Amino acid sequence: MNNPIPSNLKSESRKAAKILKEFTTISSRNGPDKIIPPHVIAKAQGLAVLSVIKAGFLVTARGGSGIVLARLPGGRWSAPSAIGIAGLGGGFEIGIEVSDLVIILNHERAVRAFAKGGNLTLGGNFTVAVGPLGRNLEGDVAIRSSAAVYTYCKSRGLFAGISLEGSGLIERKETNRKFYGQDDIRAYEILFGEIFRPTEAKELYEILDSFTEKYEIEEQSVNMRKMAREQRKEAKSSRPRSFPSSSGNDGQLTRPVHKVYPDLPSHSVPDRSSRGDCVVATALYPFEGQHSGDLPFQAGDKITVLTKTNSQYDWWEGKLKGNIGIFPANYVSVN
């Protein structure tokens, strides 16, 4: 876990970048269904990233430090503002626990409430809910809620539930003053774009911007998947599937190239029958498939890639055990 003791904004920004990576990268502990989806961060109006320590004996006390950022009108992220978190809770918990916490502010009013007042009480005027996990953008409609705030908590490297009702995000004015060199600087100036983004937070901004890129790619991929399914349905209903014979291939049938995403730059890989070499991908994680036309597989399966784009945050077309379908490219590694 990361250090919950308050530090300067440069260190807090580095810590926030590290935490976001841990919450959004597929690893041995985080399967594809155990990461914050790109669209959650891409659509957020603000977010806070903190490390929190909780100590309990009959009454639990919580404290920690981190930063908060807001989405500016042009879509860019604001400069970071240093914050702390504090709260008390009931229960018969005994012991000390350190956790990492990501708080997604879904509504602009939540950002404004914090920026103008300097503090924000969670669970007061704003509903708080555990945020959705997984990368299935098509399930976005099912998981949408009216919650103003999503929370994600990791303890000992694993996602865990946390109750933040009554906890408050507190502006660390002195830390902001020292970092930005202005005696009277306030959170609303930082979060409303009146302060330039510091170069010390470059790594954090690169990570945040990548979520918007991933979301746009996934959104386009979902639309292309829907179009591809409709085209397959129309083709099946209008005529039987047949392939013309290739004159230079001794009468063998040649599979036509099918671009799953015609608007994306792609590289088509011929079938093994028409060329001696091919691209083979090894499945890193199991994929059960969610729609007809998906290609399910297990970890370790060898998939022949038929159509691919230049991004691994996309859907590719492949062949496995005689079945052809599309699959998420970041579930595999290309041999």
Curated annotation (Swiss-Prot):
- Any single Gene Ontology cellular-component annotation: ruffle membrane
Question: What GO molecular function terms would the record report?
Answer: phosphatidylinositol binding
One Pfam family here = SH3_1
Could you say which residues form the signal peptide? none
Origin superkingdom = Eukaryota
**Mind telling me which InterPro entries this protein's record contains?**
SH3-like_dom_sf (IPR036028), SH3_domain (IPR001452), SH3_domain_YSC84-like (IPR051702), SH3YL1_SH3 (IPR035511), SYLF_SH3YL1-like (IPR033643), Ysc84_actin-binding (IPR007461)
Q: Name one GO biological process term.
A: regulation of ruffle assembly
The UniProt keyword set, sorted, is: SH3 domain
Q: Point to the regions of Basic and acidic residues compositional bias.
A: 227-237
Where in this protein does the record put region Disordered? 225-274
- All residue ranges annotated as the SH3 domain in the record: 276-335
Family assignment from sequence similarity: Belongs to the SH3YL1 family.
Quote the protein name from its UniProt record: SH3 domain-containing YSC84-like protein 1
Q: What is the lineage of its organism?
A: Eukaryota, Metazoa, Chordata, Craniata, Vertebrata
